[in-house]
Amino acid sequence: LGIHFDFHAKATDTNIGARTTPQMVAAILDKVQPDYVQVDCKGHPGYSSYPTRVGNPAPGIVGDPLRVWREVTAQRGVALYVHYSGVVDRHAAAARPEWAAYNVDGKPNPKAMSVFGPYVDQLLIPQLRELAGEYGVDGAWVDGDCWAVVLDYGGDVVRRFCAHTGAERAPRRPEDPFWQEWKEFNREGYRVYLRRYVDALKSSHPDFEVISNWAFSDHM
């Protein structure tokens, strides 16, 4: 039995965590008796609902609600997991457009990170390691991941595709040459990205559990 909180903090949210007290968390655990709890830590808007040092904390955070959840769940032997938005990160797309996937019109996608770019190494992995190491969280459920991947027309991605396949350009329509190869190239890019962060966490924090929502399903 588990509890899943799916908050998705935004820049406009205020007093995040103001009512998250040890007494409140204990009351929930005593009433529900869950085996695990999953709380939000970074939703699709890209803001973190705890005072992260490596990510982008929401401006309306009060205290450290994640620390409260971890301390009380640990005292009661209840596993604590976090919801983490992977490919979807609107804040990062706005602040670091070079991290985003590029649409066919040459503009950065407003929400989808490039699975070929530095986002995984510069934000995703460091933040998951912060959660595992600094907070002692048991694992992360990565949402907004495989189902959010888009065809990436970034210049470097297209050059790599052309070198890999011999195509002269990236196809834009299903009737264009190399369309299936283009889709599969982007799918494989996601698989490489997924393996990269799973392997990184297993290397540094082997007990930290990682799951990517809808991975290896019909959404992938």
Residue ranges and their predicted role:
Residues H4-T20, S48-G63, K107-I125, E175-Y193, ...:
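The substrate-binding groove and active-site-proximal loops of carbohydrate-active enzymes
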